[in-house]
Amino acid sequence: MKKRLIIYFNYHPNGQADAACRFAVQQMAAVGQVFFVNNGPLQPESRQWAQGCCHTVLERENTGFDVGAYRDAVLQIGLDMLLQYDEVVLMNYTLAGPVGDVAAMFAVMDGRPELDFWGLTRHYAMRSHRFGGAKAMVPEHIQSHFVVVRSRMMADFFAYWQAAALPASYEDSVRLHETQFTAHFAALGYRWDTFVDTKDLASLFVNPIMACPKLLLADRGCPFFKRRSFFTPYADELRRTDGQAAAELYDYLKSETDYPVDDLLRALLPVQPLAAMAQNLHWHYILPQTAGECAPILLDANTLAKGCALQPDAVYCLLLPRAAGVEGYYYARSMPTSLQLAQAAELFDAHSLVGVLGPALPLYAGCAAEKARRWQQQKPAVQAKLSALDCPLPLDETPPPLPNGGCLLVRGAAFPQGLPPLQTESDFWLVPLLAQYNGYASATFEAAAQCAARADVLDAALAAQRGVGPVFRLMGRTVKNALRKRKESAR
């Protein structure tokens, strides 16, 4: 086996080496020595773990993103030591896996001795003002989440990092390092390629590992996928794909591999926006047509106002304050029957990751607008209450999937500290967020009839969007031409 050094960069807002990071490092340790570099201080338990399984552990100031981490690691190791390795791997925590035996990938690439450096996947060329610099053009490149450098280019590799400047933003990191690394060394005459062959997808997707991760894992032998698949902003995802990539990836990992994907999701939940994860993973279920033999335990307003402990193996029903107006009318109509509540409670048995369930948002368009307005009004109070409970969570502009009116069903195990006093509207927003902090998801449910109607509502919304699109494009061209004429007249 080749002598390899794996420089693994990790960052976690709470200073942890989480479950997915540990799994990746332990698997990679079978194919090389691991130099673990962390942006920011590690928590004591995570530091002890890293020191126990890695060759070297470096904790550095949280500056410069991945560029700063790689640079400090390379410079600390030094050129003389780097030259003792056949390959140096740059890898970071944004990848999850491996799925399967990672040694098989290295064995395949060992059969490509003509390459001077190689990567896992590539990003294809695209126009981008955000990442493309002055020319607004991103070249085709190896993605920086996994790059392997061989010994014959090690001197130039070391010089590259000696000269590397620390980026001040994520955009700078991509623009000045990730999109330039491949071209820089190719211009010096070094040959490169990627392990995963996606040439046939280049005309469809600029970023295949995000657009079709399940395809790359199942059919292309790719041993890794992006954590971000599960929390990327869903509106962005819909501009690129049909929005099903993350759910397909999860189902594949859960049913056809041994990868502990639920451990990854439990690690992501406390540090990523709940709404984005719920949308990407489609945490929405149709009520099972069962007898509903396990009715949830009803918690009345007096009990909720005082706060209460919960039995971990029990399911509880929390009635929400009644809303006013036409929205309140539709919320009241969406309140499940006793049978539907019992059927919904059975969903907890089928989905161990779910800690909170509630009725889906009514189809009346005003309910969605009213929920978004209420969330913006209540978010500061919710954030303050989370801080008082010592539960720091990222709150997004998009509201959490619940509450939607009517009631909430909660799994007792999702609230080991019990429920805090719940009286005001901002209090009830805490329920899905506290479950999230404890590593549990929130999901919505509805009857099959409402789900069928939802498809028609979606069709109507998409038709309206298509009608508006040409108008906005015309407005855009008009503004662009006006700005061009103003610029020309100023010369």
What is each stretch, according to the model?
Residues 1-491:
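ER/Golgi luminal nucleotide-sugar-dependent glycosyltransferases, focusing on the catalytic module
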